Design a protein with these regions (language model features):
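Long, acidic (Asp/Glu-rich), low-complexity accessory segments flanking structured domains
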Residues: 33-66, 130, 137-140
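Conserved, mostly hydrophobic/aromatic
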Residues: 61, 79, 89, 124, ...
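Hydrophobic faces of well-ordered beta-strands that scaffold small-molecule active sites
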Residues: 58-60, 86-88, 162-164, 190-192, ...
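C-terminal active-site rim and adjoining tail of enzyme catalytic domains
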Residues: 38, 43, 137, 213-307
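N-terminal secretory signal peptides that target proteins for export/translocation
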Residues: 1-9
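Metal-dependent phosphodiesterase/phospholipase catalytic core, i.e.
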Residues: 38-42, 102-210, 237-240, 252
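Catalytic domains of carbohydrate-active enzymes, especially glycoside hydrolases
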Residues: 75-92, 229-235
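Bacterial N-terminal signal peptides
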Residues: 13-25
Length: 307
């Protein structure tokens, strides 16, 4: 058994190195044609078996952040190459361009200074968004949301979920995002979260099929109320709902995503979320979570006591 687990670990690290090496090739925007609507493709996505139906999807928080600079094309490429879903953050610049970055200012993750919403795209694109993490990423640019969508469409082997975190609600941002989501045919893969209710209403006005989310749900009472919210296609929760609560959410067509101890390597939380059959987990440790589950499955198949 030790030898088998050792082999699993070696496979894990080989895959990781491959993904990061692939990500390092992302030095300029990926050029990809916007996808056209294909009803047969959409039907195939809805009917084909999907791991998400058997265990929670793993949302790589800001991409594969432990191995690449957060919210950059290499971080997203590495995640998608390994079949992970992605959580990312979006702002609108002063010239109404959509960029992917977490903080309100560019100070922490670039060599510049200033508020994202008060800068033009050209000003932001002059900055280095990679060397703060490691010298091999020197010259990396803050990506646009369109570049992120292009990359995901090009690199995904099967559809991955995109969780789009709304950081600041600038005028017109909902319609701009909706147009881009439609352009790349990502309505069935994406949901937006973090926005207030009036912003969710504007998203629905822009496109009724764009999934919006209620956040900051920390207990069963709030969970029950959120299930009745017509603007809550998804629930972003900070606790583990029971299996019965999850079953009820599914009957209502709601998805439930866990945002609890994102930065911590908490196998107990991962296991509880899996047992409850949650739709997904947002974490900085998606590969370690997947490996933990695969080892559990292997041990169970071989009759190994996991206590």
């Amino acid at each position: 058994m030790e030898q088998r687990n050792h082999v699993s670990s070696r496979i894990f690290f080989v895959l990781l190195l491959f993904a990061v090496f692939t990500a390092l090739t992302i030095t300029r925007p990926v050029i990809a044609q916007p996808a056209t609507h294909d009803p047969s493709e959409q039907h195939a996505r809805k009917t084909q078996p999907d791991r998400q139906q058997r265990e929670p999807a793993l949302l790589a928080h800001r991409g594969l952040v432990r191995h690449c600079p957060e919210n950059t094309l290499p971080a997203f490429a590495a995640a998608v190459e390994l079949g992970l879903s992605i959580e990312l953050d979006v702002y609108q610049t002063s010239d109404k361009q959509l960029v992917v970055i977490h903080d309100k200012t560019i100070d922490r993750t670039t060599n510049g200074s200033g508020e994202v919403t008060k800068m033009t795209l050209a000003e932001i694109r002059q900055l280095d968004a990679g060397s703060w993490f490691h010298s091999r990423y020197t010259g990396l640019k803050v990506p646009t949301l369109e570049e992120a969508f292009q990359l995901i469409r090009q690199r995904q082997r099967k559809p991955v979920t995109i969780a789009l975190n709304m950081k600041v609600i600038s005028p017109g941002i909902e319609a701009n995002i909706a147009r881009l989501v439609e352009k790349y045919n990502l309505l069935d893969q994406l949901f937006v979260f973090g926005q207030p209710e009036d912003s969710s209403q504007r998203f629905k006005q822009a496109n009724p099929e764009l999934r919006t989310t209620e956040v900051k749900i920390y207990d069963s009472e709030h969970f029950s109320r959120a299930l009745k919210n017509p603007l809550a296609d998804c629930l972003w929760v900070g606790f583990i709902p029971s299996r019965d609560e999850m079953a009820h959410a599914r009957t209502l067509g709601k998805q439930v995503w866990l945002s609890l101890h994102i930065g911590a390597k908490r196998v107990d939380i991962w296991d509880q979320a899996r047992a409850s059959q949650m739709d997904g987990i947002c974490t900085n440790w998606p590969l370690e979570c997947r490996l933990h589950w695969r080892k559990q499955d292997s041990n169970l198949a071989n009759g190994v006591n996991q206590r």
